């Protein structure tokens, strides 16, 4: 018995020491973990955020050549002068080499300093499948609009063509009135492909000018026009003889290379030789730096706008099918000489307008978001009502005279076309709109869209005391 009691004493002492050591070691580890957390997670410096552009793109931008000579950043306390608020644009902002380098497009020739620059691009050509879809939708919309306006006395394509063909300033006196008998706008669409960007020499811009080349092909389409007229013999007396003529012109195939380039607003308009120069005025000659006063030389708008210039290369292909019928009783059908004359005239008309070196310059539309051009998709009435309820302060009075006359006299027609102006009652159910707003369908919207019930009428805080019946 004594021997067993002697063995139990060392075992209890050893277990108490092991418990104390484990307890102290656990407390020390907890203190170290808390200290490391405070040091590295609370007082540690945050790592710089990674650049999303460098992670998403395989290319890495090199430092700009202007980074070494760039001025030091200004302090926020330094107030800029009121006459120069906009920061200056670098001189190389429109340089072709800078634009292509920043967009990762390899279009600069190997030896750009040579006199004759090589017009080619080492970049892979684009297929333009998405562009073909957009162009097809646009052409289809134009065809549908032309058909819907066929009965309009002034806006139809028939009226426009008749007025253009019977222009007294261009039509010869031996041709009687031209009547359009058939018009076909076609059913197919042009196919664009093999788009490439090249750099061409331009003395008006620094480093040349960028130009897009697109191969276009349109074939097997029913694009035609048929007219009837008469050849009048006015000698020895007026209308001494009349020869009826009927023509039908169809486009069999058209293919070529379309050139598109942007003309900045500061660049003067491209010099396009005119086949009919305007006669000089009888007054004194203007000064060297004076502006011309002729209304045909000055654009109607004084605001400078960027323009887009497009043309076709001279190696285009335009195949026409001309059918003719001459005479009243004994008729001559499909005379080869008549077909040659008509084809030569059509080719001359086309080359005088859109074949290099002549280009067509069109002003780019204003893409700045304006409330007058804001529309709502017809299939999102319910979603639009909920979004408008959350933004009642952004409502605009569309029926006020000042708003309709802000951008021009025909602004009301544009709003009606876009579905924003006064319009007749719509066939869809408008209960969802009238239940939230006091707006009558078919009438102009009120200056403020007043809700029938305020949002605070049915709002209750969870756990709040009920209000007294007489409380306001």
Curated annotation (Swiss-Prot):
One of its GO terms (cellular component) is endoplasmic reticulum membrane. It is a single-pass type I membrane protein. The keyword Cell membrane does not apply. Signal peptide: none annotated. Residues 1-22 are lumenal. GO terms for molecular function: lipid binding. The chain crosses the membrane at residues 23-43. One of its GO terms (biological process) is mitochondrial genome maintenance. Residues 124-365 form the SMP-LTD domain. Residues 81-92 have a biased composition (Polar residues). Residues 450-460 have a biased composition (Basic and acidic residues). Residues 281-297 have a biased composition (Low complexity). Its main location: endoplasmic reticulum. InterPro entries: Mmm1, MMM1_dom, SMP_LBD. Residues 270-280 have a biased composition (Pro residues). Residues 44-472 are cytoplasmic. Residues 51-92, 270-303, 370-472 are annotated as: Disordered. Keywords: Endoplasmic reticulum, Lipid transport, Lipid-binding, Membrane, Transmembrane, Transmembrane helix, Transport. It is found in: Endoplasmic reticulum membrane. Homodimer. Component of the ER-mitochondria encounter structure (ERMES) or MDM complex, composed of mmm1, mdm10, mdm12 and mdm34. A mmm1 homodimer associates with one molecule of mdm12 on each side in a pairwise head-to-tail manner, and the SMP-LTD domains of mmm1 and mdm12 generate a continuous hydrophobic tunnel for phospholipid trafficking. Belongs to the MMM1 family. PANTHER family: SMP-LTD DOMAIN-CONTAINING PROTEIN, TEX2 PROTEIN-RELATED. Component of the ERMES/MDM complex, which serves as a molecular tether to connect the endoplasmic reticulum (ER) and mitochondria. Components of this complex are involved in the control of mitochondrial shape and protein biogenesis, and function in nonvesicular lipid trafficking between the ER and mitochondria. The mdm12-mmm1 subcomplex functions in the major beta-barrel assembly pathway that is responsible for biogenesis of all outer membrane beta-barrel proteins, and acts in a late step after the SAM complex. The SMP-LTD domain is a barrel-like domain that can bind various types of glycerophospholipids in its interior and mediate their transfer between two adjacent bilayers. This is Maintenance of mitochondrial morphology protein 1. It comes from Emericella nidulans (strain FGSC A4 / ATCC 38163 / CBS 112.46 / NRRL 194 / M139) (Aspergillus nidulans). The gene is mmm1.
């Amino acid at each position: 018995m004594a021997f067993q009691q002697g063995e139990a004493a060392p075992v209890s002492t050893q277990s108490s020491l092991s418990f104390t050591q484990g307890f102290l070691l656990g407390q020390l580890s907890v203190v170290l973990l808390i200290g490391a957390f405070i040091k590295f997670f609370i007082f540690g410096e945050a790592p710089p955020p990674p650049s999303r552009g460098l992670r998403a793109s395989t290319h890495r931008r090199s430092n700009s050549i202007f980074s070494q000579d760039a001025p030091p950043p200004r302090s926020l306390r330094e107030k800029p002068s009121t006459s120069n608020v906009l920061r200056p644009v670098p001189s190389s902002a429109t340089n072709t080499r800078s634009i292509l380098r920043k967009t990762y497009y390899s279009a600069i020739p190997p030896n750009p300093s040579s006199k004759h620059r090589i017009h080619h691009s080492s970049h892979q050509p684009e297929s333009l499948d998405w562009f073909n879809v957009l162009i097809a939708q646009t052409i289809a919309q134009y065809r549908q609009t032309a058909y819907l306006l066929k009965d309009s006395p002034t806006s139809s394509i028939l009226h426009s063509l008749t007025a253009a063909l019977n222009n007294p300033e261009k039509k010869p006196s031996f041709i009687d009135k031209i009547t359009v008998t058939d018009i076909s706008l076609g059913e197919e669409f042009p196919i664009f492909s093999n788009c490439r960007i090249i750099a061409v020499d331009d003395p008006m811009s620094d480093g040349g000018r960028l130009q897009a080349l697109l191969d276009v092909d349109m074939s097997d389409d029913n694009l035609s026009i048929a007219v009837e007229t008469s050849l009048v013999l006015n000698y020895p007396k007026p209308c001494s003889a009349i020869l009826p003529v009927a023509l039908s012109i169809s486009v069999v195939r058209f293919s070529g290379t379309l050139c598109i380039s942007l003309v900045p607003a500061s660049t003067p308009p491209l010099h396009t030789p005119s086949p009919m120069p305007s006669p000089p005025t009888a007054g004194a000659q203007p000064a060297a730096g004076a502006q011309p006063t002729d209304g045909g030389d000055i654009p109607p708008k004084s605001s400078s706008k960027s323009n887009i210039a497009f043309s076709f290369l001279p190696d285009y292909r335009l195949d026409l099918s001309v059918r003719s019928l001459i005479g009243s009783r004994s008729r001559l059908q499909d005379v080869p000489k008549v077909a040659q004359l008509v084809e030569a005239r059509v080719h001359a008309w086309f080359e005088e307008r859109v074949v290099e070196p002549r280009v067509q310059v069109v002003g780019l539309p204003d893409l700045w978001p304006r409330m007058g051009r804001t529309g709502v998709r017809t299939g999102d009435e319910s979603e639009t009502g909920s979004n408008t309820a959350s933004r009642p302060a952004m409502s605009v009075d569309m029926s006020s005279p000042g708003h309709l006359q802000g951008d021009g006299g025909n602004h009301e027609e544009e709003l009606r076309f876009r579905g924003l102006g006064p319009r007749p009652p719509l066939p869809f159910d408008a209960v969802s709109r009238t239940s939230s707003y006091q707006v009558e369908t078919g009438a102009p919207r009120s200056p403020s869209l007043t809700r029938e019930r305020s949002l605070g009428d049915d709002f209750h805080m969870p756990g709040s005391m009920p209000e007294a019946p007489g409380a306001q």
